Amino acid sequence: MNEIFDLMDEAEEPDEGKVTLCKVIKNADNPLTETSDKTGFFAWKLPAGELIELKGDVRFNDVVFGYVPEKRVLNKISLFAKPGQKIAFVGSTGAGKTTIVNLINRFYDIQSGTITYDGIDVMNIEKDDLRRSLAMVIQDTHLFTGTIADNIRYGKLDATDEEIREAAKIANADSFITRLPRGYDTMLTADGSNLSQGQRQLLAIARAAIAKPPVLILDEATSSIDTRTERLIENGMDAIMEGRTVFVIAHRLSTVRNSNAIMVLEKGEVIERGSHDELLEQKGRYYQLYTGQFELD
C-alpha cells in the first residue's frame, strides 16, 4: 500500500515531534515494550516515548472541509467508530462519502473540527505511519506489473509465501489463482487486463488481509459482477472485517444491512444515522432508498 500512497502523496513531511508507529511486544500483565523484531503488534509512540496500543478508534468532531475554502463539501460532520464496528456511508454522488474517506487517510487537512485516531489528533501523526495502520479495498484496484504473489505482498513487504497463500485463502482468491497455469507466479499487467473485475477485487482483499490493519476502508465496486463472484467478495470481506474498524462506501444497500451504523449523507451533512432497522422505522431518505422510491446515482 505504501507504493500507492507514494504516487498520491506530496513530499515526505519532516519529523517535528509527531506520533509514529512502532513494533511492540504485547503481554497481558506488562506494559508495551518497543522492539525491532516482527511481533504482529503495533503501538503509537508519542514524542515523550509513551506507547499507546494501536486499536483503530476513529472519531470526527464537527469536521468542516472544502477542497477550496469558500466551498464546503462537509459541514460539521461528527461520527465515531470503535474497533469491531462497521460504519456505512450512503448517499448520492457528491454527498461527501469519498471525501470522508480521504480525510481518514489525511489526503487533505480539514478547515475546522478534529479527527482523532485512538485519541490522537491525526495532525500529530506522521502521514506514512497513519496510512500503515489502514488498508483500502477500492473500486479501481491498483495492480502492478509483477506476479500475483508480488501484488498481494504489497500489503506487507516482508510477507512469506505461506502468508501470501493464507491471505488469498481468507479472501477467497486462492481457488482462482491455483487454477491459473502458473498459479501465484502468474504475471500481471499494471492495468490488470488479464483478470476480471471480480478477480482484481479479490486480490485487493487478499492484500488487505495480509496487512492486518486495525482500520479497513471498502469502496464497493459499482461495475457488474456475477452473483458467484459477488458472494465470494462479500464472504472475503466478512472474514477480514472481524475485530477491525470498517468504513464502507455503499453503492448497494443489500451489503450494509449488518452495519453497526449507517450514515445517510446529503450535500455534505449527515441527515440520518442509525441501524438498518432504525432507519427503516424513521421512514426517511434511507427508507425511500431501500424501498426504491429514491435511487442512488
What function would you assign to each model-found segment?
Residues M1-E10, E16:
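Cytosolic ends of transmembrane helices, especially the final helix of ABC transmembrane type-1 domains
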